[in-house]
Amino acid sequence: MSLFPAIESYLPHQGAKYISPDKAGQLRESMLELRAKGQAARKEFADLVKDFQSLYPKLTLERTSQWMNQAQILRPHFWNYLKGYGEITEPMFALRLYGTAEDFGVSLEVSFMERKKDEHSLSKQNRVLELPIQSPAYYFAQIDGVSQRFEGTEENRQFLTQQLAAGQVRKVLVKYDVPLSQAASREQVLSQLQEAMTALIPFYEATRTI
């Protein structure tokens, strides 16, 4: 049995359209069910984030993403930023769900909020390329508007550094995945997230104001 049954139950609805039950006609009951699933999954994710944040009390929790977007499209891949020191415009940590109901997990990343960015956010973020990287940490880079995964190798670090200098890469995140669908215990998940944090702290520090 999954440790995160609400998330597992909600993931198959990725991309579905939600209609307000009062306007859904014959779909009223199914919309009420979707809303309940979304709210339960969001709470389950938020509770995990709170447990993680309690291990790092100096991090400030931002708000968990909603279970649907403004266009009322269901959005099960929740995320939650955790602000360290500095301004809200600067890179920080974030936890983000990924995967399908059959194989899902949470990634810890160093990134910034696009809606809060200023003229320095990108240059600070891309300092993550200044440090050597080691798997299982990896890069998630935005090239021509498309985000792509790059394994954590020196070869990829050099490649992305060159692409950044050439203006081909806009933004580079550093991420570390922790599986949830097959996790044996919550303690195991939190322990693996602590390993992820240990791996990513140097990259976070690299983004700080020099």
Predicted segments with their positions:
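Long, solvent-exposed, polar/charged low-complexity segments
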Residues: 1-56, 149-210
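Compact, glycine/acidic-enriched structural inserts
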Residues: 36, 104-161
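Short, surface-exposed, charge-dense and proline/glycine-enriched linear segments
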Residues: 62, 85-99, 137-143, 169-174
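Sparse, context-dependent recognition of short Cys/His-centered cofactor- or disulfide-binding micro-motifs
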Residues: 63-67, 78-82, 91, 157-163
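Aromatic- and glycine-enriched beta-alpha-beta binding-site module
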Residues: 70-132
